[in-house]
Structures are given as C-alpha cells and as structure tokens.
Amino acid sequence: MSERQAPAKWQRLEQWLLFLLLLLAAGLRFYRLDGSSLWSDEGNTWALLSRSFAQIAQDAAADIHPPGYYWLLKLWTLVAGTNAWGMRSFSALAGVLLVYVIFRLGRLLEDEQPSLRGVALLATLLAALNPFQIYYSQEARMYLLLALVSATLFWSLYRLLTSATGVSVGAVVGYAGSGIVGLWTHYSFPIVLAAAGLTFLVLYLSSSRIRKHKARGGPLGANQAIFWRFVGLNALIILAYLPWLPTAIARILHWPQGGESIPFVEGMQLTLRTLLFGSLREAPDLAWPWLLGAALLPLWALARRWQERSLWPLALWFLAPIVLMFGLGLFSDAFLKFLLTASPAWALLMAVGVWSLPKPRVWWPPFVAGSIALAAFTLPTYYTSPTTRDNYAGIARYLQATAQPAQALVILDAPGQQEVWQYYTKYDQLTMPTLALPQQRPPDPTATIATLEAAVDNRATLYALFWATDEADPERLVERWLDQHAFKGLESWQGNLRFVTYVQPTDLACNELSSPPRFGKAIRLTALCQPATPQTVAAGEVALVGLRWQTEAGLPQRYKVTVQVLDSRNNVIAQRDSEPVGGSLPTDQWPVGATVVDNHGVLIPPGTPPGAYRIIIALYDQNSGERLRLPDDHDYFVLGEVEVVRPQQSLPAALLPLQQLIHQKLGPLELVGY
C-alpha cells in the first residue's frame, strides 16, 4: 500500500492546525485540574503512592487492578508531587498524547485512502473536545492510560500491516510496549488485544497477496515473516505478563458483581450517551441530534466504505469493549468508563462518516460547530459543579468551618472511603475523630452495632458519609441504627456520595400528652420529646421532634409520618416525610400496646427569616396519600412552635439542598440556585 504525500502547502497548514488542536486539548485537560474533589478511588491511588513498589504490587494483588499504573504514577509524582494536581497531571498528559495518537491513526487512513484527506484533523478536533476523554484526563486513575495504550496498540498494528519499507521499528516497539503496559494497567485490556489479533488475522488472511501465494501451491511465501513477527510480538507480551498472570486469573474469577444486564437498544443508547457526554448525570436538553449523529455516522462510514479494509480494524476495535459490556452485564455507572478504549475508534469513525457523505466539504462545518456546541454545553458542568465527583473536599471544608471536633464524629459507611478522607484531613488539617464501618465483609451485625454504640457515646453531632453501601453494608446496619437512635438533619447528595448529619441531644425532655391524639381508629401519639419549649433553632440547623406512638390494634397498612414547619400563613417552610423509625419499623409491623420511639429531624432551610413557626405532624397512606383523621376531623396535629434565629455560620452553597446552582449576581445579592 503506497503512501501519497500531500502538497507542501497543505502539510504546513496541517501541522499548524495540529499544533493548535493539541494546544486546545492540553488547555481543556489541564484547566482546573484540581478544581473538583478527589473521590474514593483516587484516595486509594493517593494512599498507594506512599508505599514501596513491592508493597504496591502486594496490595494490588488483593485489589481489582494490576499494579502497572500505580508504578508509573509513583515515578511521575516523584517530580509532580502527590497532591491532586500532581496525581491528575499524569492522566492529563496521557489525554493529550491520546489526541495525538488519534491524529496519527487518521493520517494512516488518509495514506491508504487519499479521498479521506482531512479525516485526521476532524477526528483530532472531536477527540480534543470530547467530554468523555476530558473527564477521565482529570482523574488520578488508570482509565485514560488504558485508552492511550489501546490507541497506540492499533496505530502500531496499522503500521505493521501497511509499512511499505520493510520492518517498522517504531511499530514493533509500539505494539510490544503498549501491549505489555496495557496488560499491567487493567484486566479488561485482553479484549483489546483480542480485537487486535482478530484484526490481524482478518486482514492477513483476506490479503490478495496471500491468496495469490496460495494459488501457487506453496506456503504463505514472503508474507510468513509478517505472520511470525506478529506471533512473536504477542508471545513477548504474554511472556512479560507471566509473573502476574496467576494473580490476574484469580482476581478475574473473583471479579465483584456490580454491573447490570440491559436490553440491546437501551445499552447502545447508554453507550452513545457516554461516548458523547461522558459521566454527566443529566444529558443536555435536545440531546437527540448528537445521539443520532453518534449512531448514524459510524454506521454510514462502515456501510459506505466496507470494501476498504483499512476501516475493519476500527470496527473491531470499536465493538470489542461494547461486546465486553454486553457479555458481562457491565452497564452501570461503575463500569461505563470501560468504554474509553472504544472512544478513539469512535472518533475516527465519526470523522470518516462525515467524509463519506455526499459533498463532505459542505458537511464538515456543521459537524465542527456541533462538536464545539456539545463541549460548550457539557464542559462547564465538569469544571464548575462541586458534585462532578464525590465532593469530599466540600464536606471537609464545611466540617472545618462549622464542626466542634470534641463533640463530633465522622462515620464512613463504607470503609473504602478512608484513604480519600485521610487525604483531606491531611491537606486541610482537619482534626476530627473518624469511624469506618462495617469493619468486616460481609458485615457482622453484632460487632458493627457494638462498635457504633461505643463510638457515638457523648458525641452531640454525627456526620455520616454513605458511599457504595450496597456492597459494604447491604442491610443498612449503620444507617438504620442512626435513624433509630439519633435525629437526622441535613441530607445532601454530593455526586455518588450521600452526606447526612445526625444530632444526639443531651437535653431532650419527653412529656406525656394529657390527651393523646388518636390518628384513625388505633394509632395514638402518647408523648412528645423536644430539647426545650419552644425550641430555638438557627436557620440551616435541625429542629428535633421525638414522637412516641402506640397502636391499640394490628395495622394492615403502612403509613408515613410527615413533620412540617409552617409560617404564619400556613406555608410549608420545612418538611420531613418518612416511615416510622427511619423506615426500619413500618406501621404494619408495630406490636400492639408497645411504645414506638420515632425520632425526626427537620432541617430549617438556610435563609429562613427569624421568627416563630408552627410544627405539625400527620400520618398518611403511602400509596394513596390520604391522611388519617383525628376525632376533631382535622388531618394534622399541632405539636407547638419553633423559634428560628440567624445562624452564626452560613452553610456552603455546595451543600445546600438545591436542584440547580446558578450563582447569579443581582446587585448586592447573589441568586445561589433553586
């Protein structure tokens, strides 16, 4: 396959455009590199970097990743440092290199098919702006390195198959090196090697030259050297991985089940959405034009140019990770990043699809505009939202500003959060006792509860960080105990991390009600527990309502309790709805005649004007929403008043329970969100 040199003028223009695109890629990947919080897995990375190379390997043997990435990152951070910027800069650099490798792959396609001249720059632009690649270029994990070595592997494979000048040393070194690094980086890399091997066999066996040699009745002739060179390179890759192979097999056989099998159409929609927008939790409005283009352009490229064998490697490379996702049922947030290895092939197929349309010079400007618009809609959220990743940094700053360490306790459920929390306690100089539970897997209920009870004794405020509890604490042992014995206040999702505050009052006074109100036919409120009458609560803090229930007969239905704070116009200022005892003791399980201890904390919203507010409660059917009535025909009972005062310390905007953050200046005021 011969190479055709572009005119010198075009070459100079192409070089300048490539330089500008790489500059753009670097700017987007290094911009606000430490602007978002480290999350749990990045905390694990940070913890491993303080250990020796041998200890890293030993710890990785018990984890679900080989040690190669950690070894390389440890060398990198000897110069760059182990703070968030230093660790993430390794991935950012890998992200820029990936964009360059995509360009080189595009140039190889252009050399094979001169009609595709321009595809390399178009694919490079798409990769430079791609939110999926940018997001993982700003994470101290191995997934961008995995995408880079996958792309380098296929670039080397193309060179091995198309070199017109004999053996390409760069291709040989690139294939062997990327194969070795890939296997030592992630256990999913064998699917990429398999795709490369299948690509080689398909192209090699379909070669007209091979068919010609076969027709002569002899062996594969001169092309045998290509075949055995490829076999030798793969043997070298496997040989370099042999020391870790037994560990890898053991870890893969015990791979944790955390994915989800979904229908094909839904899986492809999620795949395309991820390739376009990355880990964005909500796609932009009117996303369908991008999704349609992401699906149709690669299909059009393959259908229009199927006879051109140079596109076959892209097709197999693109499909390999998707087949892995469907085959193992990995469609969940935790595994969508495996699609990064398909992202370079997808970018190239998208560009080829544009160039395969009638009059491509008419279509590429809208394609470029659409790519820029997609990045403009998506990237600001990645750069500015505090919940782009699990916001441990924001929580640490909040505790540093507001918590009283002598009276507080941080509870980590699950223990996998310990390393990232230690990072922020070190760099933010946060001194506060911390308890990680459950300490066994599977959890030991007796030991877990005993440890928790001892730790929370004499602690007025508990700060619970719930993360990945489906695996670490599937029975919700920690949360159920806290719901039963403390008063839940602020509850805020910070990425995939749920931050909850609990209050343990020391001055709670329980008063029997002289005329216990009856809800419906059987439920009575026998006592009310509060710190004082009336309570005094600062805006942003929690009003405490302790309810004591009894039922005179078995209850066939499940009812929810609603506690509401009303202003003078009966507007609801704050509200908490829950099944009794934090959902752990539904009404249809209440023992007849026994007292049910049911504690509720109601967060008074930040910004609530000072003044007196009424507290009411009601019980309602959780299916129909119909409230139980009292003998006076009211469907609520007034508990008393709460006095709201101004807070001494404002709640950080990142922790406010808002659906949308705006931060719009309105003269001397700021509209934070709604």
Q: Can you say where each PLM-predicted feature lies in the sequence?
A:
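Short, Lys/Arg-rich, polar N-terminal cytosolic tail immediately upstream
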Residues: 1-10
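Terminal, non-globular segments
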Residues: 10-207, 221-513
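C-terminal luminal/periplasmic domains and tails of membrane-associated envelope-modifying transferases
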Residues: 397-404, 430-674
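Short Gly/Ser/Thr- and charged-rich N-terminal loops/segments
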Residues: 214-216, 221
